């Protein structure tokens, strides 16, 4: 089996209650042995995952149970080998918090033609389903590339 190039991945979005918890759980499932966590640039500290996000994930066999929102800190960012952000603006915010991590910060949708993953917060269930599909495809692509 090929050796993984990264031992730890941090998934970042805005509030750490919708996109990044799903991305975290999908990558954990696909990359066993890799430490995968999530945080938000404006993290809603200790908040559970958004109810619609949790329902949509559960419908696809992914549990967000036990998730507690975290706010990104510079120290946290430094402690991960790879940081995957949902939007270009998140990359800018991560860089403002910890400039030295810019070189290891990329879009979660990097392998989906560098697509940003839109925020479904307070939108319809269909919006959450669309975002889940993007996160699913992006996590598959990351797992393929990181497992080589």
UniProtKB/Swiss-Prot annotation:
EC number: 3.1.3.48
GO MF term set: protein tyrosine phosphatase activity
Catalysed transformations (reactions): O-phospho-L-tyrosyl-[protein] + H2O = L-tyrosyl-[protein] + phosphate
NCBIfam families reported in the protein's UniProt record: PRK11391.1
PANTHER family assigned: LOW MOLECULAR WEIGHT PROTEIN TYROSINE PHOSPHATASE, LOW MOLECULAR WEIGHT PROTEIN-TYROSINE-PHOSPHATASE ETP-RELATED
Family membership: Belongs to the low molecular weight phosphotyrosine protein phosphatase family.
Function: Dephosphorylates etk.
Full protein name: Low molecular weight protein-tyrosine-phosphatase Etp
Organism: Escherichia coli (strain K12)
